[in-house]
Design a protein with these regions (language model features):
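Cofactor-binding loop segments of dinucleotide-utilizing enzymes, especially the Rossmann-like FAD-
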Residues: 1, 54, 78
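Conserved N-terminal catalytic core of the sugar/cofactor nucleotidyltransferase
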Residues: 1-47
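Phosphate- and divalent-cation-binding pockets in alpha/beta enzyme and binding domains
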Residues: 6-9, 61, 152, 176
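Conserved core of the sugar-phosphate nucleotidyltransferase
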Residues: 9, 59-139
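Short, well-ordered coil/turn elements that cap or connect secondary structure elements
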Residues: 15-17, 46, 68, 92, ...
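Conserved beta-strand segments of alpha/beta enzyme cores
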Residues: 19-21, 96, 163-165
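Short beta-strand-to-loop acidic/aromatic patch adjacent to the donor-nucleotide binding site
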Residues: 47-57
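Conserved alpha/beta core of the MobA/IspD/sugar-nucleotide pyrophosphorylase nucleotidyltransferase superfamily
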Residues: 114-180
Length: 180
């Protein structure tokens, strides 16, 4: 994607013994993140996945928070504040995500119920294989590649048994730097 060469040169192919693989989206300027993620669908089905958007800065404690949480399918979220923009979610009393609210469906009258997606997710191999990737393929086939991957999660929350939970932050710092 955008400035991908700079990123690869800066990070390299290994970090502290961890192998880093890159998936190139050559049409990043004509597609959205749903297409970039669809390019990685084989990798999503090989193992558990941490999905982290590249335009984030965040407190180091967020990684262990999500990695060591016992729930296999998790989204980090933060209680809505006025500076937040983008996809929101609504939760039930057990922190199950019951709806993803895209920017165009945002209602100021509902802000007391909104949590902003931090855009750090954990998906189990099973969730990716049986839920996310099949819906990702159907969604892109029906609606194209200029959409957001959260829209697929929105569809999944409509299932009778959605296995995606939220982990609300408790004051940990994060910010989307594309808004700076």
């Amino acid at each position: 994607g955008y400035k991908g060469d700079l990123l690869r040169n800066y990070i390299g192919h290994k970090y502290k013994g961890l192998k880093i693989e890159y998936i190139e989206n050559p049409v990043y300027d004509k597609t959205n993140n749903i297409y970039s993620l669809s390019l990685a669908k084989k990798e999503l089905q090989k193992d558990d996945t941490l999905l982290i958007e590249s335009d984030l800065i965040f407190d180091d404690t967020l990684f262990p928070m999500i990695v060591y949480n016992p729930y296999p399918n998790l989204a980090l979220v933060a209680k809505y504040e006025t500076w937040m923009d983008g996809t929101m979610v609504r939760l039930d009393e057990e922190n199950n995500i019951v709806n993803f609210i895209p920017k165009k469906a945002f209602k100021y009258g509902d802000v007391d119920y909104y949590y902003k997606t931090v855009n750090i997710y954990k998906f189990s191999k099973e969730f990716s294989t049986t839920n996310y990737v099949p819906f990702l393929e159907a969604y892109t086939k029906a609606l194209g590649n200029n959409e957001y991957y959260e829209q697929v999660l929105r569809v999944i929350t409509l299932l009778d048994k959605c296995e995606l939970k939220a982990l609300p932050l408790q004051g940990e710092k994060w910010y989307e730097i594309d808004d700076v």
